[in-house]
Structures are given as C-alpha cells and as structure tokens.
Amino acid sequence: MDKFKSMTELKELTKEGKDWEIECENRSSIVTILALHGGGIEPATTELAYTIAHCGDYNYFSFKGMRSKGNNELHVTSTHYDDQIALDLVRGSQRTVAIHGCEGNESVAYIGGSDDRLIELITESLEDIGISVREAPHHISGTQENNIVNITQTQGGVQLELTAQLRKELFKNRKSSRKNRENKDNWDDLMYDFADAMKKAIERA
C-alpha cells in the first residue's frame, strides 16, 4: 500500500531537492520514456530510461527518490500518477514506455501495457540480445486505462518491469547503490545494448 495516494499529495508532504527530484527532457518527440519510480525507489530504472531516451532522441521523464533510506515511501502507483509534467509528455506522445523495477532473483523483463504492437516488437528485440522476456503477471500488467503509460494519443503504452537481478546486470560491478548507479563508467554494455534494442523496436512500430 502506497504511503501517498497521489503525486500531488506526495509533493505537498515532502521536499523537492531533499526527498526527490525530477529530471525531464522534452525533445519534441512522439515517443516518451518514463522512470516513474526512479533514483533509489526502483534502482537502475532512471539510468536505463535515460539511456534509452538518449539513444533514440526521445522525451524523458524520471522522478528520482533521493533519500539515503526509505525511498520506497515515495512510490505512487501508476494509476494515481498525476504529475503534470509527466502527464503532458505522455498525452503529447504516440508511444510511451515506462521502465519499472520488481523483485526477482532471476534475470527477467516482464512486459505489459496496452500497446500490443510495440509489446510484440520489444519482446522480439530484447530476446534477440539474450534477455528473457515474459508476459507480466496481472498485478504488474500495466493494462489499466488510467495507468499513465496508456494515456497516449493512441491510448496505449508499454510497461516494462525488470527484476532486481536484471537491473544489477546493467552495472559492471553488479551493484546498484546510488554511487554505483550514477557512475557512468560502471554502466555495463548491457545498458547500451538494451537501449539500442528498445530503439530498434520503437522505430519498427
């Protein structure tokens, strides 16, 4: 159960620059890449979303938990995600991909959302580089109409849930603490291969 029922409530009761920060790059693209629970909330999602967006010259949004501990309290579920910056980007996009993190000791990317064509293409593209992709279970399926990822101009997006193990593999030393995440020299080739695979899929959609 989330501590805050919306991003509006979260922002009223926490402090920007201390508890959290927002990174946003509007590149006037028809594609937006999101890390809604970035920074220390779901580690490695910010870094991967940033890399994908940079690779494809897409719009980018990340809400980053900055606390030394307790970042999980800053998690607001995607169906209650009323951050205006993120909403504006998604509503102006034809394709949106949200990068999330989930539990799991196995290296897996669970895929969901309502953009069936892009789901198919991303699955194929990620499997081509050796990533295990599975259909997301119901509780992380990302198919709800009011999930922010699905409020695009086409009423559909893609939600990718990466297990903790897969996210660790994005870093050379397999550690995802803030110091290790923010050191780009520690980013594994998989980070860039993943981003390139995503770009290839999006360009085919």
Regions from the PLM with identified roles:
Residues 1-205:
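N-terminal catalytic or cofactor-binding beta/alpha core of small enzyme domains
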